[in-house]
């Protein structure tokens, strides 16, 4: 969620405060703070262990941070592939080992595998054509 929130404003030519971000769970219908994410093995890559629980159906929501919206979300939807590629390039180009505020967020807040997990999720989103 952090890298999407950092990269998206460049495409929409807006400030990062113009966009809100939330991680949600389809299973419970609730928003989840990043530190409280459940865990399970990922079906995409055996190298990543304990990413999400089987009962967790995650979503990342980027939304207009203005009452009624100003069209940022619909514009973002149209350029979602380019944004995901840019997010992957941002992660790959960051010299940190496990995560930092410039890419996936500080390791103390996101965990030691956050950079690896974010990269894996982005690759799979791009493969599925989201």
Model feature map: region roles:
Residues 1-130:
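Extended, highly charged accessory segments
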């Amino acid at each position: 969620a952090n890298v999407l929130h950092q990269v998206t404003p460049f495409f929409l030519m807006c400030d990062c405060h113009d966009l809100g971000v939330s991680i949600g769970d389809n299973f419970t219908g609730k928003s989840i703070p990043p530190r409280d994410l459940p865990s399970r093995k990922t079906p995409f890559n055996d190298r990543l262990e304990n990413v999400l629980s089987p009962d967790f159906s995650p979503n990342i929501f980027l939304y207009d941070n203005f009452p009624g919206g100003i069209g940022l979300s619909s514009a973002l939807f149209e350029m979602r592939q380019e944004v995901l590629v840019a997010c992957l390039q941002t992660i790959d180009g960051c010299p940190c080992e496990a995560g930092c505020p410039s890419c996936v967020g500080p390791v103390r807040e996101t965990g030691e595998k956050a950079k690896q997990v974010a990269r894996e999720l982005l690759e799979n989103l791009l493969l599925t054509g989201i």
